[in-house]
Every structure is written in C-alpha cells, then in structure tokens.
Amino acid sequence: MRFHTLLFLSFLLLVSCALICTAQHPGLEKSGMFHENVGKGQHIEEKRSCIERMQTCEVEAGLPCCSGAPCICPYIGDCICIQ
C-alpha cells in the first residue's frame, strides 16, 4: 500500500511541475512561431521591437519586426515572428 501511495504522489508531482512550466511559458507549445533574427552588437532593448507584452508589431507604427511580417511579444524574451 505504501508503494502505491508513493508512486501516486510521484506522479502528481510530475504532473504539477509540467502544469506550472506550461503556465509560466505559454508560448512554448505554440507551433509555427520562430524567433526574430537580430544582428549582433545591438543593445538588448533594441532587440525587442514591441513596446508592451503580447502587442502586435506594426511597421507603420515605427515598430519594425521580422522584416514586416506579423509578430507578437512574449512575456519574456525577444519578439516572435509568426511564419
């Protein structure tokens, strides 16, 4: 009986870790998205083309991203191009 309880608790721990990781990084499971290629030597703030998180970049608004292709800003990291 103790073995089954320990096995069940281990399973719950693995599932909760997976759920927490997915909740903290919601963009990881989305397919068809690629990171923007940014040249070397740019400052870290210049790499991020979007102003607010999850904002869509627009070339007309002066926010260049992905050579004019649509993109989004994740919570953490560089803009992501939607290919």
From Swiss-Prot:
It comes from the Eukaryota. Transmembrane segments: none annotated. Its main location: secreted. It is found in: Secreted. The presence of a 'disulfide through disulfide knot' structurally defines this protein as a knottin. Belongs to the neurotoxin 07 (Beta/delta-agtx) family. 03 (aga-4) subfamily. JZTX sub-subfamily. This is U25-theraphotoxin-Cg1a.
